[in-house]
């Protein structure tokens, strides 16, 4: 993927008519191949920060860079796994597994091979 950088990320919300700082000058650099966990108590801004990294929310200050290029919107190079269930209820189990692959332009035959491997691994192949 490459190196992703968050530089001086700020985010404010309104609370009782006053600005409430959710994120204040957050900086993070994650190089290709690194594995990072963001931990903290409920309400400290973890999800807000991840939503900004994924392009689902805009910061009130700062910028997100991918390989030195400023990111402005969502894109296929970024994803987010949500805390709550995020299945599409109108799709089958297989179609849910293949959804991201389809969006990424993976051919149908290859999608089936990939989904078969993981559905079998989880004993869900017959669902």
Locations of regions flagged by a protein language model:
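Short coil-to-helix segment of the ABC ATPase nucleotide-binding domain corresponding to the Q-loop/switch region
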Residues: 91-98
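Helix-to-loop junction immediately C-terminal to a conserved catalytic motif
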Residues: 54
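Conserved ABC transporter NBD signature motif
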Residues: 62-74
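The feature captures the beta-strand-to-loop junction immediately N-terminal to the Walker
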Residues: 39-41
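Short beta-strand immediately N-terminal to the Walker A/P-loop
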Residues: 36-37, 80
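Conserved ABC ATPase "signature" region
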Residues: 102-125
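A short, flexible loop at the N-terminus of ABC-type nucleotide-binding domains that lies
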Residues: 1-6, 12-25
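Conserved small/polar residues in nucleotide/adenosyl-binding loops
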Residues: 44, 125-127
